[in-house]
Amino acid sequence: GLESTIAAAGLMSRAVYPKLLENKDISFFKDNISYLFYFGIFSTSLVIIFANPGLFALNPSFVIATPIVVLLAIEGFLVVLINVFQQSLTGIEKVDTIDNSTAKDYLKSNLFHVHTMRLIQTVVYVVILVIGLILLISVNTSEIDLLMYWASVLLITQIPLVIYLSLKVTKHFKFPFDIKRILVFLIASIVMSISTTLLLDRFLIYSENIYYFLPNLLIFIMFSVGMYLMLTYVADSKIRQLFKLIVQEIIKKT
């Protein structure tokens, strides 16, 4: 599904939490965050680009929900960031390892702050959603507009939490965001998105014959993936090193 596609970008960060708990050198964290953005921006862009044809493949009548999928794609990426930031902040917290820690110590710790902020975000989301749905339903709002409202609230209420956790991570990890690399990934994604969208509009024929439509769609997906990988390979030396390591591992296993 949509969430699993984007959430896969956060799998590489699973090792962050145990490493931080072991009190190892945290210098690895900056590269880890960069790779998170590398795959996160890529997977989110793919979902956005192919939302319309993907929904058409499921059912042509689903195309009307394309804007909703776009909002959920962005929200899914923010959730990945939130989860990684939360694990990182709680991973470096040592208050629970100190025998004489007091309740006041816990209240000052990341263990309390991070989870409390996430709880507040959830409560705010539910309250705004319920109030809005009651008002919209009372004026006979269409189902698609109700879904659009839900997706919008879901996305907007994640943004303050992402900002808060980003500031906390910046404070504890001495600004782990490699802006230059992240901008490279973003620019590569924009170039890929514009190029693919133009080609889709020009050449993709929307046929209800799924055996004709899907193979054609797959060609455009392969083009998008290839373009992003090529652009980032050329522009980023660490991505080139990552590719070499992946190839070496594949050769070893074969």
Where are these regions (language model features)?
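Membrane-interface junctions at transmembrane-helix termini in multi-pass inner-membrane proteins
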Residues: 74-123, 165-171
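Membrane-proximal transmembrane or re-entrant/amphipathic helices at the cytosolic face
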Residues: 167, 173, 177-181, 197-254
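Hydrophobic transmembrane alpha-helices of multi-pass small-molecule transporters
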Residues: 4-7, 44, 80, 122, ...
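Interfacial transmembrane-helix starts/ends
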Residues: 16-17, 21-50, 66-69, 104-115, ...
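Interfacial segments at transmembrane-helix termini and the short loops linking adjacent helices
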Residues: 47-80, 95-96, 100-106, 137-148
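Membrane-interface helix-loop junctions in multi-pass transport and translocation proteins
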Residues: 66, 101-160, 198-222, 243
